[in-house]
Amino acid sequence: MTLPIHTVLPELLATLRAQPNAVLVAPPGAGKTTAIAPALLQEPWCEGEILLLSPRRLAARAAAERMAELAGEPVGRTIGYATRMDSRRSAATRITVMTEGIFRARIMAEPDLPDVSAVLFDEVHERSLDSDFGLALALDAQGALRPELRLLAMSATLDGARFARLLDAPVIESAGAAYPLELRHVGRGDGRLEDEVARVVRQALREAEGDVLVFLPGVAEIERTAERLAGLEVELHKLHGSVPSVEQRAALRRSARRKVVLATSIAETSLTIDGVRVVVDSGLARRPRYDVGAGLTRLVTQRASQAAVTQRAGRAGRQGPGVTYRLWEAAATAGLPPFDPPEILDTDLAALVLDCAIWGAREPATLRWLDPPPVAAVQAARTQLQQLRALDEEGGPTGHGRALAALPLPPRLAHMLVEASDRARAAQVAMLLSERGLGGNDVDLEARLRRWASERGERAEAARRAAARWAKLAGEGGERQEVGALLALAFPDRVSRRRGDGADWLSAGGRGFRLDPAEPLARSDWLAVGEVQGQAAGARILSAAALTTAEVEQLFGAEISSERRVDFDRASGRVRVEHLRRLGAITLSRSQGDAREEELAAALLDAVRTHGLELLEGSDGAQAVRARAAYAGLDLSDERLLADLERWLAPALAGRRTLPPVTAEMLLALLDWPERQRLDTLAPAEFVSPAGTRHDIDYAAEGGPRVELRVQALFGLDRHPRVGDVPLVLSLTSPAGRPIQTTRDLSAFWRGSWAEVAKEMRGRYPKHHWPDQPWEAAANLSTKRRQGLG
């Protein structure tokens, strides 16, 4: 069969004879995945093995099986494959289709790639971390060790110019697919996604011929859509990473009945699903988003990129004329992002930083990247690796770090495996954390481990074999360890203690996690938490195992700190003296204690510095002093009081656990002698009346300094009293203290409205003397009889 890719093969072969690198852009269905590698085998420069890198296990296995079928050979002879869980190769194998992660491990182990003639990076537009890193390592190896090594970047929707600059290579473009493809934009209503998708699937089954491939963002949407399609006269398949391989193969094979395959992005690239002529595309994808500060990943559902929807549509036209139904309007396609964001910009970089250090690139940016790893993420990864003892202070790999890198696991899980005594069980826990759905989807890893032990499917068996290999690599140990203890080795910062009913948990690293209180694990006091997902505040626990308090004490004895804390408790208003035992942010125990006088005083002063003067209860006298100072132009502001706490507040704290009320005397102690003289001169505290009575002057009153007193106390005074040049505001009251007049001009009051006031007062208070000319009368607060007038 002649494929579109065959028209550009001569150009590609000629290019790779003349130079080591090339970039190939070929639309879906052109045949690049299965046609290029066999063609390169015949080239004179190709004396060794060809490595064809695939982004997914399913695609790697399917590509190898298809090429072997075309060659008329069984898989594992000339053409084989290698994935994390499975491998079919032999001494005769010339083409190995492998996942990008397997290639990364291989080139790290053998940087010169002995007996390898070419590395083909397929579907590089997906920009996975392993693909970008593998290409950077291959370019470095080519430049330093293997100048004759051929490197080919291939994709259907490639940003060709950028790859061409990186590889210093020409871009070769293939013609379109062999079959016509119709795009039907049907839009999406207001219903739930699965209802809308099910509606369009039924429409497609009526209008078009052939099997139907449906793209959905995740497993949950696949399950709900399957429920809505139940009862259709079709063969219904689910295709995602957790589906056992036997079921994956069934989804790929042609069936006697019409077939509907519900898939995630696993089916976007490098796969031919026999019989598919129709694609239904939701237009959505679910991507991980990494929070560097929190060290957590959350899944975000977002619009798929133009590159992704092009790949999806191409699935319909691989074996004949096809049609793609899109659940959006045609005009919206231009608004989709051109490509998926590179994974390197939004993921945990611990494994990459460790591998770079071992490679000799302590600064990853020194390698050749399409997009260099973000500086903040590199630093966070370096910190994590130093905590795991994988890197030294200079960023170089330690012996322990090299041992971790030798295992096909992320550094945390590799650390667990190396540090465990029960390495067989540790390898099994690592497998459960690596393979979603293995042993079920329980949060409790103990339950999943038991269920996996009884599973007999192909995936379960392959996982057991892989875990056994990991344990052997680490050097199998003996003494049994519980799952929680093992998990705590990998994620010590996620060891968590229950708060309340089990819905909320506090981790040693200070993060708060959430767990469904109906989960059996919610009854545990402690959890070793593995996977978490969501926002930094309140991320959801996906996998965990129970821990006992005794296990926590045993595992983290060296990390548990003892602390004596003397601090101010704002709720009670008292200084607390506590003895604390802590594991990170978790308080294990607390007890009350005693403190020295200077410690109590220091805690009270610190509380006022932290929370401000609002902690202090102010007396009327203290407020009056501050008002006088402000009137006199002296500084008793909050800023000065806070700056000089030791001078005016500290002396009053001796032996106290609570803050005292602020008195006038405390504030006056802050003023030096010239300031006190200025205060008394410009803002005297009292007004002494002609009757000899003393009255506080209110300097905070509206309108200026004010004095309230009985009008009789001012008899005999014809000149208005002043503070400096400012007349006092006199609030005059009756013998009963009721207000009768406010004045700033006493003389005018006496000669004006006093006559009416006196008339009223004589009626109300006949026992008191109310003279017609009060400025000539003697001031006296007594009744007429006591004055000898009655």
Show the residue positions of the predicted features.
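Short acidic-hydrophobic surface loop/beta-edge motif
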Residues: I172-S174, A503-A508, D567-F568, A683-P690
